[in-house]
Amino acid sequence: MTKVLVLWADTRSANFGVQVLARGLAELATRAWGPETVVEFQNYMPGDSPVSFTTRSIARDVGRRSGPIKTKLREYDIILDSGAGDSFTDIYGLKRHAFMVYASRSAAKLGIPVALGPQTIGPFTTAVGRRGGRYCLDRASVVQSRDDVSAEYSATLGRPVDARATDVVFALPRTEVPTSRDVVVNVSGLLWFSDRHGDSAGYRNSVRSLLGELRSAGRQVSLLAHVVDAVSVDDDAAAIRDLDSESRSGLEVVVPRTLDEVRNTVGSAEWVVGARMHACLNALSMGTPAIPWAYSRKFVPLMSDLGWDLSVDLAHEQNPGEVTAQVITTRKGADVGDQVKGVHDLADERLDAAVASLQTVGTR
């Protein structure tokens, strides 16, 4: 029986995208190493695991044979590193990057193989970040990208990927859900409250514009939170409350409590619009066309690799709301349905390649 630890993912996370990573990678692990495989999860902070892999634990682990991190890692035959989807980079700060490098270094010292599951690789904007990135790539038994831009970037760091995969959301079961909603709009607290990833005022105005355009076109709108955490400044539910209080729109608001509820909600829609990438990926994986509002490099390459060309670049599009509403009101359902099916076919092919490369772990 193989015991696998998935790093940087958690089935209890307030961010349903992180829950997707956990469940999707567990599915890949059992496909690769058999249904009896035991899969457990370790995020930065305690969640599914009682241990943290952050500063305090590292301080107690350095120089010790049986520190908290090494003790945890020793329980497993394989480490499956999710990179938190898009966090194998230094753009979120060197501190988070250091956590990942330390875990990789510790596993290497213990002789435990590390597989980098499908993820965005880079960019690394500092010399320290690039050294850490190369270190992790060089020591990984398997490296998988979830988009071709990441694959090419990994090659520039001296480590060609073993599989050009896609996001693990497409490994989750696809259940048919009756259509009961028109347009589901995910409002991102990350962009609503902070300028870290763009102009928050501009984003808020774009959301208001989108809702106005859709109402004018006679479309019914539901608002969806995809990160639900009352103590987080990134909380989507708080952003929706803010929006609703100013507009008094009376729109349906969905604040899900489980990942299945998220997937059922997006699966019930005619269209989904969102700046949380996994809100859109959940929709596409459930067969619902989605229009991502892209604020970083991670969006477009992944979508393009799957043949999905409907996205709006928030950094360059002057009228995201108007453009999005126009797509929704003019695209024909049958054509979009065929395009979604093509996405599924390509995703299945890429995830089959990911499973095949994982099966080589321990055989090299």
Q: What do these predicted regions represent?
A:
Residues 1-364:
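Active-site anion-handling motifs in enzyme catalytic cores
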